[in-house]
Every structure is written in C-alpha cells, then in structure tokens.
Amino acid sequence: MFDISFAELVVVGIVALIVIGPERLPAVARTAGYFLGRARRYVDQVKHDLHEEMELDSLRKLRDSMHETVNSFENSVRSEINKIQETTETQSAVIPDKQPPFEKAAENIEPVNTSETKTSSAPAEPRQPNS
C-alpha cells in the first residue's frame, strides 16, 4: 500500500522510540493502528460502494434496454391486432348478416288451427308393412 520496506520500518520504529519514549510508545502504536484500520475500512467501503454503484448502473442500463424491447414488441403486437380488427370490420361490413337456417324455417311454418283438426275417439292401430 505505502511501498515501505522492512529497513524503512525499522528506522521509523527507532525514531519513534527516541522521540516518544518507551513508556508512551505502546499507546501511540495502538492508536496509530486503530486509525489505520479505520482508514482502511473506510477506503474498502468506498471501493465497495463504487463497485456496487457501477453494477447498479449496468443493471439500470439492462433494465432500460429490456423495457425498450418490451415496448417495441408490445407496439408491434398492438398494430397487428388493430390491422386484424380493421380487416374483420371491413369484411363484416361487406358480408350481410345471414339468418341461421332454423330461423328461416320457423318463419315459413304456418300456424296450425286447432279448431280444424279432427280428433277420433278410436285408438290408433299400427299398419301392416307392405311386402
């Protein structure tokens, strides 16, 4: 990280021992280690946040491209549906509605007048088939 060799660390340690003194050197070393650890965690957190933000940005771009694709597909499907509806509307306007055959037959049937029909009191007998 700082590119400090072992010899340079020994020189820094000897200077710190002379300047700070042997009584306060452990407390100063602990405090320095604590602040270096905090600084390292802070840098790691910033790196993590940047990496996460870059991933989110790429995911947003992917989402936007997917939305564009879905919208274009939806528009093409809607246009095809509209074409089909227009075609069926023009064809239904050209071809007149036909009545179903059973309704035509019902119109041609004349009502039977029950007063004119004869009823017989004798029971009906089956007819012999012709041979």
Swiss-Prot record:
Residues 71-93, 111-131 have a biased composition (Polar residues). Pfam families: TatA_B_E. InterPro entries: TatA/B/E, TatB. Residues 71-131 are annotated as: Disordered. One of its GO terms (cellular component) is TAT protein transport complex. Keywords: Cell inner membrane, Cell membrane, Membrane, Protein transport, Translocation, Transmembrane, Transmembrane helix, Transport. Its main location: membrane. It comes from the Bacteria. The chain crosses the membrane at residues 1-21. HAMAP family: TatB. Belongs to the TatB family. Part of the twin-arginine translocation (Tat) system that transports large folded proteins containing a characteristic twin-arginine motif in their signal peptide across membranes. Together with TatC, TatB is part of a receptor directly interacting with Tat signal peptides. TatB may form an oligomeric binding site that transiently accommodates folded Tat precursor proteins before their translocation. This is Sec-independent protein translocase protein TatB. It comes from Nitrosomonas europaea (strain ATCC 19718 / CIP 103999 / KCTC 2705 / NBRC 14298).
